[in-house]
UniProtKB/Swiss-Prot annotation:
<comment type="similarity">
    <text>Belongs to the YajQ family.</text>
</comment>
<dbReference type="Pfam" id="PF04461">
    <property type="entry name" value="DUF520"/>
</dbReference>
<dbReference type="InterPro" id="IPR036183">
    <property type="entry name" value="YajQ-like_sf"/>
</dbReference>
<dbReference type="GO" id="GO:0005829">
    <property type="term" value="C:cytosol"/>
</dbReference>
<dbReference type="InterPro" id="IPR035571">
    <property type="entry name" value="UPF0234-like_C"/>
</dbReference>
<dbReference type="InterPro" id="IPR035570">
    <property type="entry name" value="UPF0234_N"/>
</dbReference>
<comment type="function">
    <text>Nucleotide-binding protein.</text>
</comment>
<keyword id="KW-0547">Nucleotide-binding</keyword>
<dbReference type="InterPro" id="IPR007551">
    <property type="entry name" value="DUF520"/>
</dbReference>
<dbReference type="GO" id="GO:0000166">
    <property type="term" value="F:nucleotide binding"/>
</dbReference>
<protein>
    <recommendedName>
        <fullName>Nucleotide-binding protein Tcr_1902</fullName>
    </recommendedName>
</protein>
């Protein structure tokens, strides 16, 4: 019976590359000369450190641009509120990964409402979709790609015939 998995994964290697490129740009840009500005990656949290709120916004734009170039979807970035003090400004960007319960329910509900003859079941942080025909599974993929209101990027893997 054909099946595939719906996941939301983040390529950690590409994230590291994006942060490294952003750090490189900040060190070479003229408007950041003489400032102690940097990006720091720990697990799935990117910390932006600089001296002013304006520079913090510029750094966030740099990070988003570099992440886009590396193929990381901006939807998986959760930007926290900036912490601005006298001479330092800091902001944390959390990189979300995996399908949480509300999003999984929303996806399963959309699949069931589409009346396509498949079964969808949540397994940890993935959703397994099984059906009798490969065409039905491809129709589900197209349905999910067309959904605009998903706040996480989805990938389809483990396709078995």
């Amino acid at each position: 019976m054909p099946s595939f998995d719906i996941v939301s994964e983040l390529d950690q290697h590409e994230l590291t590359n994006a942060v490294d490129q952003a750090n490189k740009e900040v060190t070479t840009r003229y408007d950041f000369k003489g400032t102690d500005s940097s990006f720091e990656l720990k697990e799935s949290m990117v910390t932006l450190k600089t001296e002013s709120e304006f520079q913090l916004q510029q750094m966030l734009n740099i990070l988003i641009e570099k992440a886009n170039r590396r193929g990381i979807d901006v939807k998986c970035m959760e930007v926290k509120d900036p912490e601005i003090q006298l001479k330092t400004a800091k902001q944390v960007v959390e990189m979300k990964e995996g399908l949480d319960a509300p999003l999984a329910k929303k996806i399963i509900k959309a699949i069931k409402e589409s009346k396509i003859k498949v079964q969808a079941a949540k397994q940890e942080d993935t959703i397994r979709v099984t059906g009798k025909k490969r065409d039905d599974l491809q129709a589900v993929m197209q349905l999910l790609k067309g959904m605009e209101d998903l706040d996480m990027p989805l990938q389809f893997n483990n396709f078995r015939d």
